[in-house]
């Protein structure tokens, strides 16, 4: 699963995964709220 750039810092990878995790949680929260309040 290592990209073409193995010298990439793990901090950037952690920030990217954290950003995608928060985005996924936000989208799920919006979907669930619209489903429950409808």
UniProtKB/Swiss-Prot annotation:
SUPFAM superfamilies: Photosystem II reaction center protein L, PsbL. It is a single-pass membrane protein. It is found in: Plastid, Chloroplast thylakoid membrane. The chain crosses the membrane at residues 17-37. GO terms for biological process: photosynthesis. GO terms for cellular component: chloroplast thylakoid membrane; photosystem II reaction center. Keywords: Chloroplast, Membrane, Photosynthesis, Photosystem II, Plastid, Reaction center, Thylakoid, Transmembrane, Transmembrane helix. Its main location: plastid. It comes from the Eukaryota. Disulfide bonds: none annotated. Pfam families: PsbL. PSII is composed of 1 copy each of membrane proteins PsbA, PsbB, PsbC, PsbD, PsbE, PsbF, PsbH, PsbI, PsbJ, PsbK, PsbL, PsbM, PsbT, PsbX, PsbY, PsbZ, Psb30/Ycf12, at least 3 peripheral proteins of the oxygen-evolving complex and a large number of cofactors. It forms dimeric complexes. Belongs to the PsbL family. One of the components of the core complex of photosystem II (PSII). PSII is a light-driven water:plastoquinone oxidoreductase that uses light energy to abstract electrons from H(2)O, generating O(2) and a proton gradient subsequently used for ATP formation. It consists of a core antenna complex that captures photons, and an electron transfer chain that converts photonic excitation into a charge separation. This subunit is found at the monomer-monomer interface and is required for correct PSII assembly and/or dimerization. NCBIfam families: PRK00753.1 (NF001972). This is Photosystem II reaction center protein L.
């Amino acid at each position: 699963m290592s990209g073409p750039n193995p010298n990439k810092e793990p901090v950037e990878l952690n920030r990217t995964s954290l950003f995608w995790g928060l985005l996924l949680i936000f989208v799920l929260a919006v979907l669930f709220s619209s489903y429950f309040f409808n």
